[in-house]
Amino acid sequence: MAVPQNRVTRSRRNMRRSHDALVAGNPNECSNCGELKRPHHVCPSCGHYADREVVAQANEVDLDEDAA
């Protein structure tokens, strides 16, 4: 069976884990709508990237009016 050959000390364990920390995100402000977005990504709220509309936003449909 696979078992550890030697005990891993607290120091060696912590040195191995020293690179596992999470990095906080760095959101930027969208130049079109002002919402926070990820750097180098299309704005999820307005669909703009680099001052052009890349993703057209769908219009919200009121289901009560269309049902009639």
Swiss-Prot record:
Keyword RNA-binding: no
Stretches the record annotates as Disordered: 1-24
Covalent S-S links between cysteines: none
Keyword hit for Ribonucleoprotein: yes
Keywords per UniProt: Ribonucleoprotein, Ribosomal protein
InterPro entries documented for this protein: Ribosomal_bL32 (IPR002677), Ribosomal_bL32_bact (IPR044957), Ribosomal_zn-bd (IPR011332)
Segment forming the signal sequence: none
GO biological process: translation
Pfam families named among the record's database cross-references: Ribosomal_L32p
Cellular component per GO, a single term: large ribosomal subunit
MF annotations from Gene Ontology: structural constituent of ribosome
NCBIfam families assigned to the protein according to its UniProt record, in alphabetical order: rpmF_bact
Recorded family membership: Belongs to the bacterial ribosomal protein bL32 family.
Protein name stated in the entry: Large ribosomal subunit protein bL32
Gene source species: Paracoccus denitrificans (strain Pd 1222)
Gene giving rise to this polypeptide: rpmF
